[in-house]
């Protein structure tokens, strides 16, 4: 009987959702890990992968951090006596010192907090990776697109040279 490496299987499926547009829209300078305050039906939906982080952002209000716009679709088998709001604002679990530091950066230096990914920590805890960044201008986005296309073209040429040699 062959044993499978259980650690690699857990790490491979640890990422629940990823915000792919965040790195295109924002220049990320720092990353922070935060916990989420969730309801039971939300955890079940997250286990099934029904999460969307694309139009999501984080704001700080009265010394607490909240994630707004994260869509968690309820399952069809969700309880009927609980009202399931798919776009409910979720509280982020951060230390007071972290919140104060982030609030200062947002207010004084014009930074934005964007959820980058959602993943499982130690199998049972849902964590969110938050990026601290500034929005890119249109010309910055065009430069990034040109660089990405050049890398693809360069790899294509290198591959063609290796096959021909």
From Swiss-Prot:
GO terms for cellular component: cytosol. The keyword Cytoplasm applies. The keyword Magnesium does not apply. It is found in: Cytoplasm. Disulfide bonds: none annotated. It comes from the Bacteria. Pfam families: SmpB (PF01668). Keywords: Cytoplasm, RNA-binding. GO terms for molecular function: RNA binding. InterPro entries: SmpB, SsrA-bd_prot, SsrA-bd_prot_CS. One of its GO terms (biological process) is trans-translation. Its main location: cytoplasm. Required for rescue of stalled ribosomes mediated by trans-translation. Binds to transfer-messenger RNA (tmRNA), required for stable association of tmRNA with ribosomes. tmRNA and SmpB together mimic tRNA shape, replacing the anticodon stem-loop with SmpB. tmRNA is encoded by the ssrA gene; the 2 termini fold to resemble tRNA(Ala) and it encodes a 'tag peptide', a short internal open reading frame. During trans-translation Ala-aminoacylated tmRNA acts like a tRNA, entering the A-site of stalled ribosomes, displacing the stalled mRNA. Belongs to the SmpB family. This is SsrA-binding protein. The gene is smpB.
